[in-house]
A protein has these predicted regions:
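Processing junctions and N-termini across compartments
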Residues: 13, 17-20, 251, 339, ...
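A residue-identity detector for tryptophan
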Residues: 75, 85, 108-109, 185, ...
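Flexible mid-to-C-terminal extensions adjoining Fe-S/redox cofactors in radical SAM and related proteins
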Residues: 1-9, 29, 33, 272-273, ...
C-alpha cells in the first residue's frame, strides 16, 4: 500500500489544465510550441472539490498545494472560492500555490493574500528579468508578474521566488536573489532542472524550442557552472558504467517512494486520484509512447479504466485503498521493468539517483520568514 486513507497528510491538487505560458520542458506543450493534442482541457469546480474532499479529511490534512502538472492554478475560475472553503474548514491548514504569476489583476492578488492568510504561501516561478524570463516562461508578461507579486506581498502574502537555472540566465542568480529580497519575497530558491533527459533516458546538452507551427526558434542549454547543474543527470553516465545500461540500473535499484514517505496523494484536473504528479505527467503529451506511459496506462486499464479513479464518482478512501495504488506499490517488488516494475517510479524515486532532491541549489530564507 502506498498510503492508508487514515494516514493522509498532504494533497497536491491540479485545479485546471489551462495555462497561458509555453514552458519548453513542460509536458503540456510540444517543446514550448503548440499544446499537445491529447490533453483534456478541464478544471475542477468548487462544488466538485467539496464533493471529493470530506470535511473530516480536510480537518486533519497538514498541507494542500496547488501545483499543476499541465496547468497553472490561477487560471482556474474557482481557485479563490476553493481556497476560501479549505480555510473555513481547517484554519490551521497550510495552503500553497505554484504559478508563473502572469494572469489576474493586482486586486485579485491582494484578495489571494487575504484568503491564504498566515498559513499560506505562493511560489512565483520567475527565471530572470525582463530580458530573460520569457526565454523559458514563454508568452508570459514579466512586468505584469512583478506587479502581481508586489500586490500579493503588499497585502501580506507570503511570497517565494523560485528561479530555474539555464545557461541564458545563470549569470543572474545572485542579482535576482537580491531583487527578490528588495521586493519583499520571504524566500528565494535557485533550482536545477532535471529535464535535459529524453523519454528514453538519454542525456541531452540542449533542447530545441519550437514555435506553435513546429519550427525551431532557439535552444535551451544547460548552465556552464556545474553548481547549477542537476548532479543526478551527471550521475546517469556513472550508473551506466556500473550497471552496463541504464535499464539494468532501473531493474536493480530499490524504490523509495516520496509520496509514501510524505503520506501524499495527487488529484488531477479531470478528477482522478493517482499516486503522484510524476505518474500524471506520463498520461498525456509527448511521453505517451514511452515505456513509462504505457506501463501506467496498462495498469489503469487493468483496474477498469479512468472511471474507477474518478473522485467525483468514488471516494478518496476507495481509490487510495483500491487496486491501482496496490498494483503500483506491488510493482516495486518485481525484479525487472519487463516483469512489471514501474519504470517511472524507478527513475524518479530510485534511491541512487534522486532527481528531485538534487534540484535545489541555494535556498535563502530571510529574517522575516520564520515559518519554513
Amino acid at each position: 500500500m502506498i498510503v492508508d486513507y487514515n494516514d493522509l497528510e498532504v494533497c497536491q491538487i491540479e485545479l485546471t489544465t489551462e495555462c497561458g505560458a509555453g514552458c519548453p520542458q513542460c509536458p503540456r506543450n510540444v517543446h514550448g510550441g503548440k499544446t499537445v493534442d491529447d490533453l483534456p482541457i478541464c478544471e475542477l469546480s468548487l462544488d466538485e472539490i467539496k464533493k471529493i474532499f470530506p470535511t473530516e479529511l480536510v480537518k486533519r490534512l497538514r498541507l494542500v498545494f496547488f501545483c499543476g502538472t499541465y496547468g497553472d492554478p490561477i487560471w482556474a475560475r474557482d481557485v479563490l472560492p476553493v481556497i476560501k472553503w479549505l480555510r473555513e474548514v481547517n484554519p490551521k491548514l497550510e495552503i500553497g500555490l505554484n504559478t508563473n504569476g502572469s494572469a489576474r489583476t493586482e486586486k485579485w492578488w491582494g484578495e489571494m493574500a487575504n484568503v491564504l492568510g498566515d498559513n499560506g504561501y505562493v511560489v512565483f516561478s520567475i527565471d530572470g528579468d525582463e530580458e530573460t524570463n520569457h526565454i523559458y516562461r514563454r508568452y508570459t508578461d514579466y512586468n505584469k508578474i512583478i506587479r502581481n507579486a508586489k500586490a500579493f506581498i503588499k497585502s501580506g502574502g507570503e511570497a517565494i521566488l523560485e528561479f530555474l537555472v539555464f545557461r541564458h540566465n545563470e549569470h543572474q542568480v545572485e542579482d535576482i536573489e537580491k531583487f527578490s529580497k528588495e521586493l519583499g519575497f520571504k524566500r528565494f530558491t535557485s533550482k536545477k532542472t532535471g529535464r535535459f533527459l529524453t523519454k528514453d533516458h538519454t542525456i541531452i546538452q540542449k533542447q530545441e524550442v519550437l514555435s506553435k507551427e513546429g519550427e525551431i526558434e532557439y535552444y535551451l542549454e544547460k548552465p556552464k557552472n556545474p553548481e547549477y547543474r542537476n548532479i543526478s543527470l551527471e550521475k546517469i553516465d556513472k550508473l551506466i558504467e556500473e550497471h552496463t545500461t541504464f535499464d539494468d540500473y532501473l531493474n536493480q535499484v530499490p524504490i523509495k517512494c516520496l509520496v509514501k514517505q510524505k503520506k501524499e496523494l495527487y488529484l488531477s484536473a479531470d478528477g482522478l486520484i493517482i499516486p503522484c504528479g510524476w505518474l500524471a505527467d506520463r498520461m498525456y503529451g509527448l511521453h505517451t509512447d514511452s515505456k513509462s506511459s504505457k506501463q501506467f496506462w496498462d495498469l489503469i486499464h487493468e483496474v477498469g479504466g479512468k472511471d474507477g479513479l474518478d473522485a467525483r464518482k468514488h471516494s478518496i478512501k476507495e481509490i487510495v485503498e483500491g487496486k491501482l495504488f496496490k498494483k503500483v506499490s506491488e510493482s516495486w517488488t518485481k525484479k525487472t521493468i519487463s516483469e512489471g516494475k514501474m519504470e517511472r517510479c524507478a527513475v524518479v524515486c530510485g534511491q541512487d539517483l534522486d532527481i528531485l532532491k538534487n534540484q535545489a541549489v541555494k535556498i535563502y530564507r530571510y529574517e522575516s520568514y520564520d515559518k519554513k
